[in-house]
Amino acid sequence: MSSGKITQVVGPVVDVAFAAEDKLPEINNALVVYKNDDSKQKVVLEVALELGDGVVRTIAMESTDGLTRGMEVLDTGRPISVPVGKETLGRVFNVLGDTIDLEESFPADFEREPIHKKAPAFDELSTSSEILETGIKVIDLLAPYLKGGKVGLFGGAGVGKTVLIQELIHNIAQEHGGISVFTGVGERTREGNDLYWEMKESGVIEKTAMVFGQMNEPPGARMRVALTGLTIAEYFRDVEGQDVLLFIDNIFRFTQAGSEVSALLGRMPSAVGYQPTLATEMGQLQERITSTKKGSVTSIQAIYVPADDYTDPAPATAFAHLDSTTNLERKLTQLGIYPAVDPLASSSRALAPQIVGEEHYAVAMEVKRVLQRYQELQDIIAILGMDELSDEEKTLVGRARRIQFFLSQNFNVAEQFTGMPGSYVPVAETVKGFKEILDGKHDHLPEDAFRNVGSIEDVVAKAAKMKF
């Protein structure tokens, strides 16, 4: 095991010099520095660049406080490796695979896998087209998720990305009994803590492994924690043959962390100050998230959109890798419609008659047509009022508003805030409900009856209790 000495510390970036006779560590190898000769207090560094003359530039996975020039650095001879297997379920890890849930840690000889791997070979990939039922009406009807696909949840700050992810974890675990890996990348520690205790209370934690590299951690940890979560998910797929759900909240923070260290590594910034290697880094992560003949990894990624600008390089780079997009719209939160999913901006390549069936496809297309026409008529309504519309247009507006409200529903994970029990709506019920609204069967019911309910039967029951 070769050793070197720290020559420079600039924030999270550390330069290490090795003697001429020592073998230089390979790129992505993990190096270890022990603070104050205390074997418990160590900092792990990852090799990013070889500068020549026996010097390597590394990124710290933990705070570099207390590191000084001249400290000894040991090469572990391999990349960061993390625990894998069924024992990881119900546990919480950091980027290095250390447990952070105050329970017993894993022994040193426990099975581990390196976080840096190649994507599966082309001939190992599977191309199935099976729908993953989420129980959330707006998603299942208009932008369905594919098993083994990649889904992006796009939205600005505070529009409900994390709540939607929590509901998806809840529904998949309760209704499908599926294994999930939740990766918190650069998000709020409070949210991670809340999620952990909520999942523990509901029993969902037994089917979930959690990995966190939160906002307060150095950029190195936020850059690599997504790979830690992915490595755990890949093991379930490749060795256990499972269908796994990988949640990443938030993929933008992965890009942001890379941007923070990019200039310190000596790279010239590109558009909007992002790292020039943005597309490569995103590709290396996304290409590993795929389905093989052994099992599948379905990933659901929250993607923060800076200043609601979809042309920003970070969300734009992520777009290229996705099968489905779920766009969250601030205007809908102002109308009190939750989840605030934009039915016209959200899309999915699974919304095709050969995948979802003729009836589902026809209903979804008609819902989109009605909502699109309603959007076009809103300018006329705002200027001239409803009286200037034809009878046909007035009927269409009434149905569009009912559809818009019916796309909302109460979430199980939001019950503590709303005081209303959540609802899981099967796809068949969703299609039936919207078909009845389009056919005019419920034109006589008040619009408010359609707000925050599950199936169409719930609408009828709610309307019966209302005075109108």
From Swiss-Prot:
Catalytic activity reported: ATP + H2O + 4 H(+)(in) = ADP + phosphate + 5 H(+)(out)
Membrane-protein topology: Peripheral membrane protein
Uppermost EC category: translocase
Keyword terms, alphabetized: ATP synthesis, ATP-binding, Cell membrane, CF(1), Hydrogen ion transport, Ion transport, Membrane, Nucleotide-binding, Translocase, Transport
Gene3D superfamilies xrefs: 2.40.10.170, Bovine Mitochondrial F1-atpase, Atp Synthase Beta Chain, Chain D, domain 3, P-loop containing nucleotide triphosphate hydrolases
Keyword Transmembrane helix: no
Entry binding sites for ATP: G155, G156, A157, G158, V159, G160, K161, T162
GO molecular function ontology, one term from the record: ATP binding
Compartments it resides in: Cell membrane
InterPro entries assigned: AAA+_ATPase, ATP-synt_VA_C, ATP_synth_F1_bsu, ATPase_a/bsu_AS, ATPase_alpha/beta_chains, ATPase_F1/V1/A1_a/bsu_N, ATPase_F1/V1/A1_a/bsu_N_sf, ATPase_F1/V1/A1_a/bsu_nucl-bd
GO cellular component: plasma membrane; proton-transporting ATP synthase complex
EC number(s) given by UniProt: 7.1.2.2
Pfam families documented for this protein: ATP-synt_ab (PF00006), ATP-synt_ab_N (PF02874), ATP-synt_VA_C (PF22919)
Spans traversing the lipid bilayer: none
Coiled-coil positions: none
Record's signal peptide: none
PANTHER family, per database record: ATP SYNTHASE, ATP SYNTHASE SUBUNIT BETA, MITOCHONDRIAL
Family, per entry: Belongs to the ATPase alpha/beta chains family.
Subunit-level organization: F-type ATPases have 2 components, CF(1) - the catalytic core - and CF(0) - the membrane proton channel. CF(1) has five subunits: alpha(3), beta(3), gamma(1), delta(1), epsilon(1). CF(0) has three main subunits: a(1), b(2) and c(9-12). The alpha and beta chains form an alternating ring which encloses part of the gamma chain. CF(1) is attached to CF(0) by a central stalk formed by the gamma and epsilon chains, while a peripheral stalk is formed by the delta and b chains.
Biological function: Produces ATP from ADP in the presence of a proton gradient across the membrane. The catalytic sites are hosted primarily by the beta subunits.
Protein name per its UniProtKB record: ATP synthase subunit beta
